[in-house]
Amino acid sequence: CLNFLERPTDGQVLIEGKDLGTLNEKELRKQRSDIAMIFQHFNLLMQKNVIDNICFPLQIQGVKKKEARAKARELLKTVGLEEKEKAYPAQLSGGQKQRVAIARALASNPKILLCDEATSALDPQTTASILELLKSINEQFQITIVIITHQMSVIREICNRVAIIEHGELVENGL
């Protein structure tokens, strides 16, 4: 519901003071372009190599191939995978796949990065490295990162504000 891919049955979703429920389709698409997502299972295109996976959202936006590849290479450095540019997802570890997914999410310069159980499929050491990367991205790009997780260790490690939602109800929030 945060990105309004699904409409909430009740309440409001406010992003930068805008109630997404009041926006028309064109305005909603524009607002969604400021929100990127990473998922538990990476959602990489298996038939595309790493650089093409990262370029994919830029291709959809009509960015020229040379410019898209330059941006993708810059993001590969950010996530520490510059040597994996030509690898395919099947050749990567889970942590490397998640780093590619993060780079792809950052390609369109979002204001908000929505992480839906982004570390739950990873081992503890890889989870720690992904959380460090997310902290670095938050500081470097000044992106708001929203983490959806059931892992309390993730919350303790990275979150500076917490909201607990149970059965669709906000039951607790704070610093």
Predicted regions mapped to residue ranges:
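ABC family nucleotide-binding domain
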Residues: 1-141, 145-154, 158-159, 164
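ABC ATPase "signature
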Residues: 173-174
